[in-house]
Amino acid sequence: MTAAPMFPAPMPRVGIAAVDHYLDRGFDSVVGMSSHFAAAVCCNLLKIQTELGVKGPIAEIGTFEGRFFIAMAHALQPGEKALGIDLFDWPNPAVIDRFEANCAKHGIAAERRITWKTDSRTMKPEDVLAKLDGRAPRLFHIDGEHSRHALSRDLERATAVMPPDGLIVLDDMLHPGYPTLMVAVQAHLEKHPEIVPLCIIDRQTIVGATKFVLCHRDWFKRYEERMLKVFKDNIWPLGADFEPHWCLVLSLDTRLADIT
């Protein structure tokens, strides 16, 4: 008889001291909505990239006060920078000061980050590359305006600057408050068959919602092979069926329904 999986499954560790320290002791003190679980997964993905020889900066649309941004920045290698893109006007203009203060408090020095106060609706792919000195971001986290049109636009920009070994992470997928976002993702995948879902990061709470991770089809197996080992305790057995593409589901709840 097969033993039932542990519930909840263990929170993944990253194995990068600065990342694990921040996730354990600083993450929850920074105002934001992304989950500890999603941050641990994405920082592990950055570590996997490094092990595979993937180099470069990262970018994020919707940086807010920096909760997720700081975690990812700690997973970068020396000389790699993190670009934070936001209007920085909600809930008040002082949010940019709180972002800068949070970065400084939690160890992301000014020379390791780029703060870009701009409207992603007017941003062009070449503008992103110019901010990064011509280097394509190896991971692009999209947590901007939660409308179908805005996500479609942000996805096109991220895809335009995505290197062959790059990753795109999408926030608040399958969220009951934003049901049409999935429509934008499906349309984008149909338009860009070279891009496929790499994994689904299950929600930790309704606030710490589900994320999708996308990659180039040619890199899917290379990433998946590493992920099967790194996330062995967090793999939901049935996976996700994107018809016909299949990908991993990572979760803190890997149980199946008991129907016996």
Describe the predicted segments one by one.
Residues 1-141, 145-169, 173-260:
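A short alpha-helical cap/connector motif
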